């Protein structure tokens, strides 16, 4: 059964309705950013249905009442000692408890999670997944993962619901073949993912006997209408841009306040949600130094810096109220000045003269014989120069020197 969900509310209601129709009060989930985007877990919990994450990192985040901080490794901000404490204190309330003698050895932590999840896999009647790709020519859905939990969710329960963003659709298996090689190399550095699962509807007597596919819009058609921003829909969620970004490296994923962190989140979230309504969303296009490293590593060549600049312009436009602000007036003045060479030359001469006057009034000598301008009276300038020294202006401007020496060709030795 194929469903269309215009927004998050419709998507959550479709999944909840399937769960209610089968009389279940819990489901198991494959790691899916689309379900996080629509806040599916919270919506199901409001209707008395528990949604259990089965990806190890997502399980850690869920048991710790935390939020993911990375697209590929959601619990990267947790060390193994913290994970041990989460398992020991929280696992029992969600199902099979962790062993009393659990240590922080990775092998033991993985074994505790495996035993805890196995009971849920065997008990669950309904599973929810996303999809990395959907093949239009056959209706096949594809999930790539590394732990095997996805395959358990896709084969053991009687009912499977897959929530898929409409941008995940590729035309043919030939197109899919390209992405199956591209994604693992860009995300984990592997030639292929350990588990690649594909399913095309129901196979009698094998796997889920009822399959629902929910095609999710939730702002994607609006993004498609944006000629600059639409390239963000090419994202395959490899997280290469996060790993290269100096801003993400220093702030972490939680600082973005978004399901999608990092450079891709800085453009995807404002595109999906729109700007001008939420201060946190409006701040995301500015969470970048525009260094371009994200563009260099992106396997699908999303020009993230260009989209960031595009979104910054949209944020500015969204907050205009008809009255020019100080920044607007300053930018208009700068455009008027720098847009004409003669005006700029006059301004340089006037500025040089003013600087000389101020320099004479406030000049002071720094160690090493260098001169600088000390405190300047007046609004604005006094606040800046009270704690900072400004370099003393040269007696001759660059433009004047260039004209006099023909670019240095006639300069005396």
Feature map (PLM): residue ranges:
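A glycine-rich phosphate-binding loop feature that marks nucleotide/adenosyl-phosphate handling sites
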Residues: 10, 193-205, 237, 248-252, ...
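Iron-sulfur (Fe-S) cluster-binding modules
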Residues: 1, 14-26, 42-46, 183-204, ...
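The feature marks the mature, well-folded catalytic cores of soluble enzymes
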Residues: 1-228
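Ferredoxin-type iron-sulfur electron-transfer modules in oxidoreductases and energy-metabolism complexes
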Residues: 206-232, 242-243, 247-367
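Secondary-structure junction/capping motif
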Residues: 55, 79, 105, 172, ...
């Amino acid at each position: 059964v194929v469903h269309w969900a215009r927004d998050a509310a419709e998507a959550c209601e479709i999944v909840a309705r399937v769960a209610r129709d089968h009389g279940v009060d819990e489901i198991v989930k494959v790691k899916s950013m689309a379900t996080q985007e629509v806040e599916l877990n919270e919506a199901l919990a409001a209707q008395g249905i528990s949604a259990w994450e089965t990806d190890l990192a997502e399980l850690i985040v869920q048991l710790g009442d935390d939020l993911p901080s990375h697209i590929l490794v959601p619990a990267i901000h947790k060390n193994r000692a913290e994970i041990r404490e989460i398992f020991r204190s929280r696992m029992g309330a969600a199902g099979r408890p962790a062993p009393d003698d659990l240590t922080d050895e990775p092998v033991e932590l993985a074994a505790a999670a495996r035993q805890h999840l196995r009971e849920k896999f065997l008990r669950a009647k309904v599973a929810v997944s996303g999809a990395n790709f959907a093949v239009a020519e056959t209706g096949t859905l594809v999930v790539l993962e590394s732990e095997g939990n996805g395959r358990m969710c896709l084969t053991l329960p009687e009912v499977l619901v897959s929530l898929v963003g409409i941008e995940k659709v590729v035309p043919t298996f030939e197109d899919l073949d390209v992405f199956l090689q591209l994604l693992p190399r860009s995300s984990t550095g592997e030639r292929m993912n350990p588990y690649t699962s594909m399913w095309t509807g129901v196979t009698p007597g094998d796997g889920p006997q009822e399959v629902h596919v929910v095609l999710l819009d939730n702002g994607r058609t609006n993004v498609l209408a944006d000629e600059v921003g639409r390239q963000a829909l090419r994202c395959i969620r490899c997280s290469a841009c996060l790993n290269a970004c100096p801003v993400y490296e220093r702030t972490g994923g939680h600082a973005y306040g978004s399901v999608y962190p990092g450079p891709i989140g800085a453009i995807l979230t404002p595109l999906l949600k729109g700007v001008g309504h939420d201060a946190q969303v409006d701040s995301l296009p500015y969470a970048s130094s525009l260094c371009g490293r994200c563009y260099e590593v992106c396997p699908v060549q999303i020009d993230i810096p260009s989209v960031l600049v595009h979104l910054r312009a949209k944020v500015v436009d969204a907050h205009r109220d008809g009255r020019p602000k100080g920044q607007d007036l300053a930018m208009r003045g700068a455009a008027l000045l720098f847009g004409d060479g003669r005006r700029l030359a006059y301004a340089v001469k006037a500025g040089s003269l003013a600087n000389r006057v101020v320099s004479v009034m406030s000049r002071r000598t720094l160690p090493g014989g260098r001169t600088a301008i000390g405190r300047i009276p007046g609004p604005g300038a006094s606040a800046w120069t009270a704690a900072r020294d400004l370099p003393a202006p040269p007696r001759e401007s660059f433009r004047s020197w260039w004209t006099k020496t023909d670019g240095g060709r006639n300069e005396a030795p």
